[in-house]
Structure formats: structure tokens, C-alpha cells
UniProtKB/Swiss-Prot annotation:
Induction: Specifically induced within macrophages by phagosome acidification. Induced at 37 degrees Celsius in minimal medium, suggesting that nutritional stress is a regulating signal. The lineage of its organism: Bacteria, Pseudomonadati, Pseudomonadota, Alphaproteobacteria, Hyphomicrobiales. The keyword Signal applies. Coiled coil: none annotated. Keywords: Signal, Virulence. Residues 219-238 are annotated as: Disordered. It comes from Brucella suis biovar 1 (strain 1330). This is Type IV secretion system protein virB5. Residues 1-20 form the signal peptide.
Length: 238
């Protein structure tokens, strides 16, 4: 009897445990959880799209402030790089020693066009003739150099005006910055060439004095050859 009771109790225990392990399905709760999950996914997708838009806007702003627009060389005239020759001192020396033969290019052309009479042709002494020719060529050479300087500066100013017009046509900050940098570069080049022209003018004045002194020495030499009294000898006599 005791065994029967124990068996019945065990059977009840197993039955109760089996019933306790059966899952209970709540369809409403599952549907609500799924809806919440989908809503979160939609929000995540919207946030990702907003982040993409923000990234694109920041990239556009970055590109507007950086990068190369290729405007550093716009409207640049390479012939204006240096309108005064780098060897202009050598040109002066050549004129002093060669006279007409040293005149070349625009200087020679202008000399031929402007000269109505050659005051040096009748001079037989070679040194005297070359000194005479040098004094004839020198002002022509100065005019050519000064004209080049004026024309080049005028063209640079026209370039600057055109660059300023280009600035008014664009709203690109980087393009404007490049154009402004180019304008500053052109202004610096004008100042640099103006300094060179000033040095050239000083050299020209010094060259005039050298030509005058050379002519004075040649005259003294010719007077001595002819037996004429020298200026210093005359001063000493008085």
C-alpha cells in the first residue's frame, strides 16, 4: 500500500512539473515589441540620413575653403616677368666700348629711325668716334628701357583690374583668396620692378658722368697731341 501511495505522489509531481513548463504565448505583446523595434529602426535610418547630409554639407564647406582653383596663373602675361634685361649693366659697358656696333634690337631700330644726322661720322680718331657714338646711343637706350618699364607697368595694372573683376564674378571663398593672392603678387612685382628701374636710372646717371669724363680725357689727349696747353697748366700759369 505504501508503494502505491508513493507511486501516485510521484505521478502527480511529474504531471505538475510538465504543466508548469508549457510556454504561454502573448500575441499582443509580440506585436507591440515588433512595432517598437520597427519604430526604432526608422529613427536610426533617419539619424543616419541626417548624419550623411551633415557630412556632405561639411565636405562642401571644406572644399570651398581648400583645394586648388587654378586661378594663380589666370590672365598672367609671361612677357611681363622681367621687362628690364638682367644684363643691362653689360649693355652699358658694351655701348661704351663699341658705340654703334653695340646697339641692337629696339635700340638699333629706334636709333635708325630717329637719327637725322650722324655727328660722329667725320671723326677720324677711333677712340673719339666711339666715345661720340656712345653718347649718341646712350639716350636712345635709356628711352627704350623706360618705355618698356612704362608699358609693362601699365599692363600689370590692367591685369590687376581684370583680377578684381573676376573676384566680383565668383562667390567661391577659395577662388577669391587665390585671386587676392595673385593681386598681391602683381603689386609686389610692380614694386620690385620699380626698384630695379630706380637702380637703372641711377646707373644711367652714373654712366652719363663716365661718358662726360671719358670725353674730357680724350679731348685732353688730343690737345696734348697737338701741343695745346692743358687746362691745369693754364690754371697754374695764372
Amino acid at each position: 500500500m505504501k508503494k502505491i501511495i508513493l507511486s501516485f505522489a510521484f505521478a502527480l509531481t511529474v504531471t505538475s512539473t510538465a504543466h508548469a513548463q508549457l510556454p504561454v504565448t502573448d500575441a499582443g505583446s509580440i506585436a507591440q515589441n515588433l512595432a517598437n523595434h520597427l519604430e526604432q529602426m526608422v529613427k536610426f535610418a533617419q539619424q543616419i540620413e541626417q548624419l550623411k547630409q551633415q557630412f556632405e554639407e561639411q565636405k562642401m564647406q571644406f572644399d570651398a575653403l581648400t583645394g586648388y582653383r587654378g586661378l594663380g596663373d589666370i590672365l598672367r602675361d609671361p612677357t611681363l616677368r622681367s621687362y628690364l634685361p638682367h644684363n643691362w649693366r653689360d649693355l652699358y659697358e658694351a655701348v661704351m666700348s663699341g658705340g654703334y656696333l653695340a646697339a641692337a634690337g629696339e635700340t638699333a631700330n629706334l636709333l635708325r629711325k630717329s637719327q637725322v644726322y650722324d655727328p660722329c661720322a667725320s671723326i677720324s680718331d677711333k677712340d673719339q668716334r666711339i666715345a661720340c657714338e656712345a653718347k649718341v646711343v646712350k639716350p636712345v637706350q635709356d628711352k627704350v628701357m623706360t618705355s618698356k618699364a612704362y608699358d609693362a607697368t601699365d599692363k600689370r595694372l590692367q591685369e590687376i583690374e581684370s583680377l578684381m573683376q573676376e573676384i566680383n564674378k565668383t562667390g567661391d571663398p577659395k577662388a577669391i583668396a587665390e585671386l587676392q593672392g595673385r593681386i598681391e603678387s602683381e603689386n609686389a612685382m610692380i614694386q620690385n620692378e620699380d626698384t630695379r628701374l630706380h637702380l637703372y636710372q641711377q646707373m644711367a646717371e652714373a654712366q652719363d658722368k663716365l661718358l662726360d669724363e671719358r670725353q674730357h680725357e680724350l679731348d685732353a689727349k688730343d690737345n696734348a697731341r697737338r701741343g695745346y696747353p692743358q687746362p691745369k697748366a693754364l690754371e697754374a700759369a695764372y
